[in-house]
Amino acid sequence: MLNHVVTRFAPSPTGHLHLGGARTALFNWLYAKHNNGKFLLRIEDTDSKRSSKELIDSIINSMIWLNIQHDGEIILQSSRISRHIEIANQLILNDKAYYCYCSEEEINLEKEQYTKKGLHYKHNCIWKNRKPPTGNCSKVIRLHSDTEGITEFKDKVYGTIAVNNVQLDDMVLLRSNNTPTYLLSVVVDDYDMGITHIIRGTDHLTNTARQLLIYNALGWKPPEFAHIPLIHDENGNKLSKRHHALGIHEYKNAGILPEALVNYLLRMGWSHGNDELITIDEAIRWFSIDKVGQSPAGLDSKKLEFLNNHYINTTNNATIIEMIIPIIEKTIGYKVNTEKIGYLLNGINELKKRTKNLVNLANESLFYVEDIPISFDQESLIIIKSNHDILSILYDNLSKVLNDDWNNSTLTSMIKNIVKDYNTKIHNIYHCLRASIIGRINAPSIIDIMVNFQREECLNRIKYARDMVK
């Protein structure tokens, strides 16, 4: 266990929290918890045109839902702009940065010339060693970057990473409108927040090399870095919040449990032997960066379904019902009768066994809690319309069964007698019972459901179905 570990998650509120961001947050959180450290949350909201409070709230709510809890107050990067400007000016005073007065047109022309020659573009500012022009000229602050040698760091996933300095230009630190760039703001914030370890995607590798130049210019000790492989979709294409990636809120709305999604994210690039089902306590105890692989992680919808089914079945029934009742009420358009929740509580175990998600479970549970008239699927309607006589026979015979005798044995015997007395087929009887009582043909044991509903509810439903086709 390491001493004094501080990690962070620093999302940009230009979109909802997606899988890649959630996994980054999870890995940083687990690393901090494993080492008894702190996990901080910083919202990088300096892009005022694309950031919004709605998206900030969405990110925070998604993290709360996933139970990835940050320590301390949330830091808004926009509240620290004056500090970023202060550091940019400090670099000027220490001759580690300079004012660039090149116009946008001049820079674009320079880029074109490099492109024509097939060279990697690196801005060569003519003002680097000149006196500033007279008058009120637009300017930016650029870092004095090394033009020779390499920038090297040890990554906790990929080992030693070396970037040729010829690829790193004199990056802009402060724009002409006096706003800091991402590269400067991140370095200053991470340093001031005491961040010791940064875990993020491999798409930041070049950013890391650039940020190390800023750390060196300031004489600050950089944090340790771990770059985790990106997530690919099921076709092997890179996932991003602009392409194919669902937001965490969409997984929630689709009926995925947070425990299932966390387990799913955990196994995207990290492993602990052959373990697939991992509790959060086990994850905290076992998590280490050296178990993160270097190959991209891929989406696997079947695995997510498996995990979700597992966590639905291991969550107590009362909690699951509390989750699905709002979905049911939205579907049927009225408040569920408390008495009928008892039917659902008695019958939900069978439904849980084969469900993929809470939305599916809610739809499969409708017949338990619906008032008459219940909803019928198309197949049930066809059966009801063509079996009026059978429904009448079922109603008349079941009406003779007393409440105290309404049990599995009595009902099974009666159905056998009806088949014998009326020369019909048993599967036709069961189809009629399912169609009239639950409105569908595919369901758990109809006898068990009838015992659960008891006599009055079953007779009322059969009577309604029979009378539909009088």
From Swiss-Prot:
Recorded name of the encoding gene = gltX2
- Return the broad EC class: ligase
Q: How does it assemble?
A: Monomer.
Which HAMAP family does this chain map to? Answer: Glu_tRNA_synth_type1 (MF_00022)
Q: Per UniProt, what is one GO molecular function of this protein?
A: tRNA binding
Q: Which Pfam families match?
A: Anticodon_2, tRNA-synt_1c
The reply to whether Lipid biosynthesis figures as a keyword in the UniProt entry is no
Catalysed reaction, written as an equation: tRNA(Glu) + L-glutamate + ATP = L-glutamyl-tRNA(Glu) + AMP + diphosphate
Instruction: Please report the name of this protein according to its UniProt entry.
Output: Glutamate--tRNA ligase 2
List its EC numbers: 6.1.1.17
Keyword terms, alphabetized: Aminoacyl-tRNA synthetase, ATP-binding, Cytoplasm, Ligase, Nucleotide-binding, Protein biosynthesis
Q: What is the lineage of its organism?
A: Bacteria, Pseudomonadati, Pseudomonadota, Alphaproteobacteria, Rickettsiales
Name its GO BP terms in alphabetical order: glutamyl-tRNA aminoacylation
